[in-house]
Swiss-Prot record:
It is found in: Virion; Host nucleus. Belongs to the influenza viruses nucleoprotein family. Keywords: Capsid protein, Helical capsid protein, Host nucleus, Host-virus interaction, Ribonucleoprotein, RNA-binding, Viral nucleoprotein, Viral penetration into host nucleus, Virion, Virus entry into host cell. This is Nucleoprotein. Encapsidates the negative strand viral RNA, protecting it from nucleases. The encapsidated genomic RNA is termed the ribonucleoprotein (RNP) and serves as template for transcription and replication. The RNP needs to be localized in the host nucleus to start an infectious cycle, but is too large to diffuse through the nuclear pore complex. NP comprises at least 2 nuclear localization signals that are responsible for the active RNP import into the nucleus through cellular importin alpha/beta pathway. One of its GO terms (biological process) is symbiont entry into host cell. InterPro entries: Flu_NP (IPR002141).
């Protein structure tokens, strides 16, 4: 089936009947956007750790390796090569799975199945652990499981007259075969590609699920959700993962470590554990954007026997990050099924930026399709998909609405569930829909917190974490933050705490008319060279916060 046929899928609310094909013309009206070459990013940005900020090594005459920074053009070329190779790997896996129809290859769930299989196949530590545990289980008389294999649920398309639907099939692969195929395709170990996929899964989790249980477990208020980006990222995502993690996520990791150290006083005598703990705190310090926040982390780093006082300090730090936001990298991460289409989409540049025009142009050209679960509304599902791709779970909904020309709703108002279909819901004849929300305007992504305060808040999420660098007020619930400020500042670090609370109060006292990202504009999606900047229109009737009153499933309740 051609790409144009995908537009024919009816995008209504699913009930038990499969979707019917109806003649559609949206493919004809969608403009073909050719990606541009962006102006080189500033030197300031190239210092941050991310998949796009890599270095190459060259040999000196005496044979010693030195690090040479890549130019912006070299970076974009290497990123282009990475995403194209990921797409090639996806096509090879789909051939092995016997799924060759365009509709099957455009399906988000099939892309996720391949991504999960790849991550499982390349996680040698986990495989080793599973084998050892299974060996113990077998001795106790339990069933033997072959951990050299991994698999997933794919969806095969079935045509019935004018109706098309999808049926689930289980397919397994040898881990070693998958790993070899991936390394051969990438021409290396392909760690940057694996990290890219992990970030995509994390962004989708941030959008689809709440993390109130994870927050409460370490004594943090669920209203700090906007600081909790990247909370489901595995440790093996390394510095790339740290760059996209929110401050609250790192605070959570540190508090859990302190909890373990309090239960086992010998833990931090182990050099490996101590190094891991110090690394978390240093990453946290690097995230902080205010000297008062850094001073509080220094206080915790200097503690010989971390305990309750340190947990209180870190809790205050997390609260301060709602007002003075840390630096969180934002990236566009698309399903690898979209990267597989790059050769067919007329995407003829050999440069690609995950934070600029190219990624947004590719998103607009793509025709991704998703399985609809029982009760899902296709338009609402499209909103979830858009926010997942752009890592916009904690972005101001008014900004997203302005960029897409679609009124975005808070999570509690969306009639749809996450993209992962649990085993109990996998049935014959599942309907699907095109993810139809596209960008009408674009703006570069940001890694800054945009630290000027204003706006109104809600009872759930009380602050935003900016993703797009466009001038706007930063939404913040001042009332909710003031409740957080009423805490005891006595003790060993009264001055440090007092300074931080004063900074929060001073920031809160600013006029509500102050904007962040002064002078930054948006551009029409056809304006690849930023010729005509447009001021973003902020519609006051749309709520600021996606998780304002949350009714989403909790990530901890998932049954994979």
């Amino acid at each position: 089936m051609s790409n144009m046929d995908i537009d024919s899928i009816n995008t209504g609310t699913i009930d038990k009947t499969p979707e019917e094909l109806t003649p559609g013309t949206s493919g004809a009206t969608r403009p073909i956007i050719k990606p541009a070459t962006l102006a080189p990013p500033s030197n300031k940005r190239t210092r941050n750790p991310s998949p796009e900020r890599t270095t190459t090594s060259s040999e000196t005459d005496i044979g010693r390796k030195i690090q040479k920074k890549q130019t912006p053009t070299e970076i974009k070329k290497s990123v282009y090569k990475m995403v194209v190779k990921l797409g090639e790997f996806y096509n090879q896996m789909m051939v092995k799975a016997g799924l060759n129809d365009d509709m099957e290859r455009n399906l988000i769930q099939n892309a996720q199945a391949v991504e999960r299989i790849l991550l499982a196949a390349t996680d040698d530590k986990k495989t080793e652990y599973q084998k050892k545990r299974n060996a113990r289980d077998v001795k106790e008389g339990k069933e033997e499981i072959d951990h050299n294999k991994t698999g997933g649920t794919f969806y095969k398309m079935v045509r019935d007259d004018k109706t098309i639907y999808f049926s689930p099939i289980k397919i397994t692969f040898l881990k070693e075969e998958v790993k070899t195929m991936y390394k051969t395709t990438m021409g290396s170990d392909g760690f940057s590609g694996l990290n890219h996929i992990m970030i995509g899964h994390s962004q989708m989790n941030d959008v689809c699920f709440q993390r109130s249980k994870g927050l409460k477990r370490v004594g943090l208020d669920p209203s700090l959700i906007s600081t909790f980006a990247g909370s489901t990222l595995p440790r093996r995502s390394g510095t790339t993962g740290v760059a996209i993690k929110g401050g609250g996520t790192l605070v959570d990791e540190a508090i859990r470590f302190i909890g373990r150290a309090m239960a086992d006083r010998g833990l931090l005598r182990d050099i490996k554990a101590k190094t891991a703990y110090e690394k978390i705190l240093l990453n946290l310090k690097n995230k902080c954007s205010a000297p008062q926040q850094k001073a509080l982390v220094d206080q915790v780093i200097g503690s010989r026997n971390p305990g309750i006082a340190d947990i209180e300090d870190l809790t205050l730090l997390a609260r301060s990050m709602v007002v003075v936001r840390p630096s969180v990298a934002s990236k566009v991460v698309l399903p690898i099924s979209i990267y597989a289409k790059i050769p067919q989409l007329g995407f003829n540049t050999e440069e690609y930026s995950m934070v600029g025009y190219e990624a947004m142009a590719l998103y607009n050209m793509a025709t991704p399709v998703s399985i609809l679960r029982m009760g899902d509304d296709a338009k609402d599902k499209s909103q979830l998909f858009f926010m997942s791709c752009f890592g916009a779970a904690y972005e101001d909904l008014r900004v997203l609405s302005a960029l897409t020309g679609t009124e975005f709703k808070p999570r509690s108002a969306l009639k749809c569930k996450g993209f992962h279909v649990p085993a109990k819901e996998q049935v014959e004849g599942m309907g699907a829909a095109l993810m139809s929300i596209k960008l009408q305007f674009w703006a570069p992504m940001t890694r800054s917190g945009g630290n000027e305060v204003s706006g109104e808040g809600g009872s759930g999420q009380i602050s935003c974490s900016p993703v797009f660098a466009v001038e706007r007020p930063i939404a913040l619930s001042k009332q909710a933050v003031r409740r957080m400020l009423s805490m005891n500042v006595e003790g060993r670090d009264a001055d440090v705490k007092g300074n931080l609370l004063k900074m929060m109060n001073d920031s809160m006292a600013k006029k509500t008319s102050g904007n962040a990202f002064i002078g930054k504009k948006m551009f029409q999606i056809s304006d690849k060279n930023k010729v005509n900047p447009i001021e973003i229109p902020i519609k006051q009737t749309i709520p600021n916060f996606f998780f304002g009153r949350d009714t989403a499933e909790d990530y901890d309740d998932l049954d994979y």
